[in-house]
């Protein structure tokens, strides 16, 4: 029998790893200055992975398919696999949230953050390698 994984207060940490079935990470966004929204993630989909957010502080707007929803502190959003989605902080106030994802999505995010050059072609290839698709 394996032991449970316990993390200190997440505050920017990750619970789980690419070796687990799912990963929980606490993320923060500083807020959006006036003007068009600054997407935290580009419009994309995961063919075989669900993804969810639980908002701890602030507000996120999530585009799920053709619908936009606003999620305030205490609410959550689940995006089913195969559904185009993106999200952003519509406020100038910071947002703090938990991102609940599969190990595959976690590895995708790690690979994106490790990229030296984020060209559209390179990003599309990383998404494709993780059974996902970059849509914009």
Q: Predicted regions span which residues?
A:
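Short acidic-glycine-tyrosine-enriched beta hairpin
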Residues: 3, 18-20, 66-84
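A short glycine-rich, His/Asp/Glu-containing loop-to-beta-strand
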Residues: 4-43, 49-50
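Short beta-strand segments
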Residues: 41-43, 64-69
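A generic "binding-loop/recognition-motif" signal
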Residues: 48, 67, 83-84, 93, ...
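Glycine- and acidic-residue-biased ligand/ion/polar-headgroup-sensing regions
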Residues: 48-60, 65
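Short beta-strand His + acidic residue motifs that chelate non-heme Fe in jelly-roll/DSBH
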Residues: 62-63, 79, 85-91, 97-99
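Double-stranded beta-helix
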Residues: 90-136
């Amino acid at each position: 029998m394996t032991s449970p994984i316990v993390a200190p207060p997440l505050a920017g940490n990750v619970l789980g790893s690419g070796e687990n079935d799912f990963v929980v990470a606490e993320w923060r966004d500083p807020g959006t200055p006036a003007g068009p929204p600054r997407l935290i993630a580009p419009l994309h989909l995961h063919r075989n992975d669900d993804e969810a957010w639980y908002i701890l502080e602030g507000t996120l707007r999530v585009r799920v398919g053709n619908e936009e929803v606003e999620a305030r502190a205490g609410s959550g959003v689940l995006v089913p696999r195969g559904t185009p989605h993106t999200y952003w902080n519509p406020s100038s106030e910071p947002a703090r949230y938990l991102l609940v994802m599969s190990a595959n999505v976690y590895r995708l995010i790690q690979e994106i953050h490790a990229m030296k050059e984020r060209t559209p072609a390179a990003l599309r290839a990383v998404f494709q390698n993780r059974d996902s698709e970059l849509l914009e």
